[in-house]
């Protein structure tokens, strides 16, 4: 079956009650509810992840990724991140720090049309 799970860590506009934007709420989910934290760690350990709409500036998620790398002594599945306008240094950092291969795309006038087209090609390939 070609159904791939989509993890919306900060919630979804389709379900407004699920949206978590404050640092306090995020930390509550990740650290006060160990089950949630363990589910995320398991996903990051056992699956190849495509990050989309995530800039790697969230310290709490970064902490989980670092835990996964430490728990597995740096040997994890390779992940991918579809990110706008990423330079070589940042891409190398993400690869070495989190085993995340960057798929960079150019934005034009703050448009992310290139990312959307890339995702559409992935969906067609499934």
Identify the function of each model-found stretch.
Residues 1-3, 14-17, 37-126:
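SIR2/sirtuin-family catalytic core signature
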Residues 25-38, 64:
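Active-site glycine-rich loop that binds ribose-phosphate moieties when present
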Residues 19-24:
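PP2C/PPM family metal-dependent serine/threonine protein phosphatase catalytic domain
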Residues 6-11:
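Active-site-proximal beta-strand elements of phosphoester/diester hydrolases
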């Amino acid at each position: 079956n070609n159904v791939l799970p989509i993890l919306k860590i900060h919630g979804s506009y389709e379900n407004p009650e699920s949206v978590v934007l404050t640092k306090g709420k995020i930390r509550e989910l990740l650290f006060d509810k160990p089950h949630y934290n363990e589910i995320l760690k398991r996903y990051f350990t056992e699956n190849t992840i495509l990050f989309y709409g995530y800039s790697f500036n969230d310290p709490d998620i970064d902490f989980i990724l670092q835990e996964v790398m430490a728990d597995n002594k740096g040997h994890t599945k390779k992940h991918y991140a579809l990110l706008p306008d990423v330079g070589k240094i940042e891409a190398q950092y993400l690869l070495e720090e989190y085993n995340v291969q960057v798929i960079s795309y150019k934005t034009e006038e703050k448009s992310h049309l290139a990312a959307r087209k890339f995702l559409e090609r992935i969906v067609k390939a499934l």
